[in-house]
Amino acid sequence: MEEPRHSKRPRFLAPNQASGGPPTEPGCSGVDREDPVDPVQPAKPTAYVKPMRREPPARAQPAPPAGRGQRGGGSWRAGRGRGSGAGLLRALGERVGPGMYLVHLNDHGELGYQGQLEARQTPAFSFTEAALMPGIVQEGPGPHAAQPEVGLQEPPPAPGPVAVARQTMLAPSPSLSFRPPGGSSTLCIVQTSNSTIVQSVPVFPAHSAH
């Protein structure tokens, strides 16, 4: 009787069989198989985009309005002031401060020139200058020397627009009066908040007896 031949091929045992553990299932090798490697996937496509800069459309500046000509026949030059009529104010009026212009109006409420202004304020001057005027105050003692009289006096009435402006004053204004020697009138100088008024007041015989 022949003995069964043993295969000469080396037989690999699983670790659990070598240590006496239960045999592994058929078809399963003792070596742990690695996870199947996924095929190399193509990378995501890269898009090269050129950035475009969007600029707002430029505003079209309106043409300057055509105005009346100046006295010399020229055209008005549009200014760069805040308002639309800044150039007109700069051309018509006189500058009284930063960004401020004094514009004269005629009787109809229209823009006029400085020559059309009927009443203008007289420049104010101090009483010291009035006292140094020649022919009014005489130096040296004498009974007939002009004696200044300082007091409060209402401004003399005046016709026209100046009288309307003076009606707004509520308090009397300081005044300075001079009577020249041998003269028939008294020079009154009234200082107001807006201007200085100089007026000659006639002296009647009843007042000259003082």
Swiss-Prot record:
It comes from the Eukaryota. Residues 1-82 are annotated as: Disordered. Residues 69-82 have a biased composition (Gly residues). It holds the Pfam family PRR20. Residues 1-11 have a biased composition (Basic residues). Belongs to the PRR20 family. This is Proline-rich protein 20G. The gene is PRR20G.
